[in-house]
Each structure stands twice: as structure tokens, then as C-alpha cells.
């Protein structure tokens, strides 16, 4: 499988790799693909992550068991492309109240306020912060205040959209 990931992948090649790993009977291939996300060859690792972002919902469930590992990787990742792809994978996962990690909440809050961070990562962190903090009114209030703070700076259209979407959800919670 590694040789398939060593070059630029087309959309049809991504779909072929998704089909190859589809279904529970191919969980061993999903694990092989996941291990390739850790490969020393950046192209291989990025392509493997990219394939996971295209998994259908049923196959994406397999990644739920990797939830904490993916969060740990976010906390350490310095490559913005890999980080963006891992955050995309996490956006497709549930954040249960009893399993929320404060270190990841802190990570998301720090990234969404970092004007030097890429817009896509900031937008993803806005969404992920909400998914984690929505269980507690006091944390939602903290997120609302943080979002109000960044609203004064120039935001890209994508970042502004994420901001508006999450603010609408926060305000609809009727805690204010």
C-alpha cells in the first residue's frame, strides 16, 4: 500500500484506496493505512491522512478507537498540512462529555486565537472547541467570550463562516 501513496494522488485514486479498505473485513488494511500516517516520508503520511478524510461514515467509525491518539498527535504536530488533516478527521468524530480532554480544549482555544495560525486550522479549532465545550454552560460562555474577542480582527471568509456558525449554536443554547 505504501507504494500507492508515494506520489500525488488523484481523486479517483483516493476513492480506490477508500474502496480497498472499505468494510469491517478490511480493518487490517485500515490499520496498515493508519500506520502509514506515521511514515517518515511526508508525502506518504499526508496521502494516508488524506485518504482517511474521504472515508464514508461507516468506515470512519473505525477511527473512533484512535480518538485519543489523534488528539495526542495534534498536540505535537508541527506540520500544518498534517495537523489540518488530523483536525478534519477529529471533526468527524463524536466528543462525549465524559471523555473530553482539557488539554485539547486548551489547544483549540490557543489555536483559534493565534493570528499566525492558518485560517483553516483556526476555523477547525473553533468548531472543535464548540464540540467539546457544548456540554457545559460555563465553558460555552468562555468560548463565546473568546469568539467575541477575535471578531474584532480581520477574518477570512472561511474563518468568519465558522465563527458565525458556532456563535449561532452557542446563542441557541439559551444559557444567555
Regions found by a protein language model. Give the residues of each.
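Alpha-helical scaffold domains
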Residues: 1-176
Amino acid at each position: 500500500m505504501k507504494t500507492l501513496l508515494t506520489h500525488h494522488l488523484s481523486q479517483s485514486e483516493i476513492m480506490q484506496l477508500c474502496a480497498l479498505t472499505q468494510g469491517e473485513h478490511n480493518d487490517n488494511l485500515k490499520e496498515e493505512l493508519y500506520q502509514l500516517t506515521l511514515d517518515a516520508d511526508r508525502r506518504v503520511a499526508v496521502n494516508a491522512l488524506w485518504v482517511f478524510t474521504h472515508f464514508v461514515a461507516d468506515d470512519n467509525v473505525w477511527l473512533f478507537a484512535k480518538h485519543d491518539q489523534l488528539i495526542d498527535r495534534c498536540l505535537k504536530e508541527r506540520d500544518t498540512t498534517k495537523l489540518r488533516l488530523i483536525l478534519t478527521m477529529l471533526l468527524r468524530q463524536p466528543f462525549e462529555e465524559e471523555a473530553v480532554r482539557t488539554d485539547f480544549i486548551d489547544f483549540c482555544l490557543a489555536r483559534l486565537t493565534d493570528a499566525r495560525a492558518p485560517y483553516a486550522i483556526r476555523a477547525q479549532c473553533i468548531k472543535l472547541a464548540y464540540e467539546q465545550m457544548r456540554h457545559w454552560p460555563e465553558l460555552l460562555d468562555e468560548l463565546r467570550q473568546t469568539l467575541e474577542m477575535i471578531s474584532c480582527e480581520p477574518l477570512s471568509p472561511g474563518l468568519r463562516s465558522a465563527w458565525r456558525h458556532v456563535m449561532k449554536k452557542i446563542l441557541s443554547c439559551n444559557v444567555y
